[in-house]
Swiss-Prot record:
Transmembrane segments: none annotated. Its EC number is 2.1.1.177. This is Ribosomal RNA large subunit methyltransferase H. Homodimer. It comes from Shouchella clausii (strain KSM-K16).
Length: 159
């Protein structure tokens, strides 16, 4: 299975990068993992609704340019469906069973995702109704992917 994690912005916090690197190493036993970061759009702190839409559109175009046409796309979005770890594992396993061996997870920037990214997504996934920094969310996603593969293989994991 080929899994791509696409996100907006460069990871800055060393401790988050260390955590992601650890889970990437662990995941390499189960799947081919690719991490792609696209530049975030520089914008002032206070934006009009139209300016926010334009920032998300530009970031969305960068994300979409990195997705292969045959990828199954799962966008992380607060309004997405929440799943247990077991349900996520089953979802990933079923995608592989039905010939979807390329999965792309998308994490938006600080303003979220563009309408074009939502339109391309095959599925919206939420980890919580709370808002998290997108860099921290990337670490949580890597951990949940690792946990999913452990569950799929019937290997022990912490509950």
């Amino acid at each position: 299975m080929n899994i791509t994690i696409l996100s907006v912005g460069k990871l800055k916090e060393k401790y988050i990068k260390q955590g992601i690197d650890e889970y990437k190493k662990r995941l390499s036993a189960y799947a081919k993992i690719q991490e792609i970061e696209v530049p975030d759009e520089k914008a002032p702190e206070h934006l009009s609704t139209e300016d926010m839409r334009l920032v998300k559109k530009k970031e969305g175009e960068r994300l979409l340019a990195k997705i292969s046409a045959d990828s199954y796309v799962i966008a992380l979005a607060i309004e997405g469906n929440m799943k247990t770890s077991e349900q996520l594992a089953k979802n990933i396993e079923q995608l592989g069973t039905y010939g979807k061996s390329k999965i792309a997870f998308i994490i938006g920037g600080s303003l979220g995702l563009s309408n074009d990214v939502y339109a391309r997504a095959d599925e919206l996934l939420s980890f919580s109704k709370m808002t998290f920094p997108h860099q921290l969310m990337k670490l949580v996603l890597f951990e949940q992917l690792y946990r999913s593969f452990r569950i799929m293989r019937g290997e022990p994991y912490h509950k």
